[in-house]
């Protein structure tokens, strides 16, 4: 009896399963899409059961994000104050050599603009070609020194320095002045790169020692408690500013705020050009000592030796005209 019931049950079981499956199928539900990619939900469960979008990742992007997370976020660097170097120059056998040495130094200084002023009525081909190849931001000016001022005992380069000052003021006349520093870079000086780092932080007028000047190994401002209190110099200690032209820098804002400050011809005694200029824009108490409280020499008034051209032929010249 039991055997007969079991046989009937097993015969009916497949039909019962078929009926259950047919009842469970909803003909209105679309069939699932077949895909070669593994299926995953585009959301993940967040706090409180909320569904949060799940971002897909790629190996390249994950690696870049890891690098960015480990790298500190750098703030944009403030713009360096521009250093304006005014260089008077005049024609002579060593002119190109002097300018080459100076350009090799300036080329290593960031954010420097070279204002080269020739002592002549027109621009020379030598200086124009030189500046075109110098690889430096530059301005080429020219102004001749009046004949009556070309005396050995009179100050030189007065008109040229004033031309550089006039160009700066005109350039910034109708625009807000960017941070900048001005200094007078004669072409017969030698400069340490450290000097440019020192002068770039000038707030008003900064000063430092100068080597090989005034008949001494160096001249310098005397400093006490961070203030200039006197001058170590070999000539006229009574000068208001007993300093060489290579021994100071001036903020661009000070130059623009004092439009009448220039180098004077009339009423200026020999050797007093620096003092007469600085008196118009500052006082000794306001000077900012640089170069470790004026105890380091970072600029030298080297002066190229006067060349001996006694053997230069007057006749039977070389057939090739070489620029020197």
UniProtKB/Swiss-Prot annotation:
Pathway field: Protein modification; protein glycosylation
Any GO molecular function: metal ion binding
GO cellular component: Golgi membrane; membrane
Residues reported to bind Mn(2+): 188
GO terms of biological process kind: carbohydrate biosynthetic process; carbohydrate metabolic process; chondroitin sulfate proteoglycan biosynthetic process; protein glycosylation
Glycan attachment points: 68, 293
Pfam families recorded: Glyco_transf_43 (PF03360)
Active-site annotation: 274
Principal place of residence: Golgi
Membrane topology: Single-pass type II membrane protein
Region (Disordered): 34-78
Enzyme Commission code(s) on record: 2.4.1.135
Swiss-Prot/TrEMBL keywords: Glycoprotein, Golgi apparatus, Manganese, Membrane, Metal-binding, Signal-anchor, Transferase, Transmembrane, Transmembrane helix
Tissue specificity remark: Expressed in the cerebral cortex, cerebellum and whole brain.
TM region(s), chain numbering: 3-23
Reactions this protein catalyses: 3-O-(beta-D-galactosyl-(1->3)-beta-D-galactosyl-(1->4)-beta-D-xylosyl)-L-seryl-[protein] + UDP-alpha-D-glucuronate = 3-O-(beta-D-GlcA-(1->3)-beta-D-Gal-(1->3)-beta-D-Gal-(1->4)-beta-D-Xyl)-L-seryl-[protein] + UDP + H(+)
CDD domains reported in the protein's UniProt record: GlcAT-I
Subcellular localization: Golgi apparatus membrane
Organism superkingdom: Eukaryota
Ranges facing Lumenal side: 24-324
Annotated Gene3D superfamilies: Spore Coat Polysaccharide Biosynthesis Protein SpsA, Chain A
Segments on the Cytoplasmic side according to the record's topology features: 1-2
Protein role: Involved in the biosynthesis of L2/HNK-1 carbohydrate epitope on both glycolipids and glycoproteins. Substrates include asialo-orosomucoid (ASOR), paragloboside (lacto-N-neotetraosylceramide), Gal-beta-1,4-GlcNAc-beta-1,3-Gal-beta-1,4-Glc-pyridylamine and Gal-beta-1,3-GlcNAc-beta-1,3-Gal-beta-1,4-Glc-pyridylamine.
Assembly notes: Homodimer.
Annotated family: Belongs to the glycosyltransferase 43 family.
Record-given protein name: Galactosylgalactosylxylosylprotein 3-beta-glucuronosyltransferase 2
Protein species of origin: Rattus norvegicus
């Amino acid at each position: 009896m039991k055997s007969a019931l079991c046989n009937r049950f097993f015969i009916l079981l497949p039909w019962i399963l078929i009926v259950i499956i047919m009842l469970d199928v909803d003909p209105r539900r679309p069939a699932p899409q077949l895909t070669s990619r593994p299926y995953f939900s585009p959301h993940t469960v967040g706090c409180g059961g909320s569904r949060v979008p799940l971002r897909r990742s790629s190996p390249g992007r994950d690696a870049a994000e890891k690098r960015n997370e480990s790298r500190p976020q750098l703030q944009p660097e403030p713009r360096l104050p521009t250093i304006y170097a005014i260089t008077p120059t005049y024609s002579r056998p060593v002119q190109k050599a002097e300018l080459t040495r100076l350009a090799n130094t300036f080329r290593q200084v960031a954010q420097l603009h070279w204002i080269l002023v020739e002592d002549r009525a027109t621009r020379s081909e030598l200086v124009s070609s030189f500046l075109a190849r110098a690889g430096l931001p530059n301005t080429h000016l020219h102004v001749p020194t009046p004949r009556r001022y070309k005396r050995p005992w009179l100050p030189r380069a007065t008109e040229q320095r004033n031309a550089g000052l006039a160009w700066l003021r005109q350039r910034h006349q109708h625009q807000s002045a960017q941070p900048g520093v001005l200094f007078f870079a004669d072409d017969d000086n030698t400069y340490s790169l450290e000097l440019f780092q020192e002068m770039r932080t000038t707030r008003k007028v900064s000063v430092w020692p100068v080597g090989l000047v005034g008949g001494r190994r160096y001249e310098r401002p005397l400093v006490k408690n961070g203030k200039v209190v006197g001058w170590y110099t070999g000539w006229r200690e009574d000068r208001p500013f007993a300093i060489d032209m290579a021994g100071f820098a001036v903020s661009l804002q000070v130059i623009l705020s004092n439009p009448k400050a220039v180098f004077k011809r009339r009423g200026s005694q020999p050797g007093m050009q620096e003092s007469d200029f600085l008196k118009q824009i500052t006082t000794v108490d306001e000077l900012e000592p640089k170069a470790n409280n004026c105890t380091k020499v970072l600029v030298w008034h080297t002066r190229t030796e006067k060349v001996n051209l006694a053997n230069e032929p007057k006749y039977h010249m070389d057939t090739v005209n070489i620029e020197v």
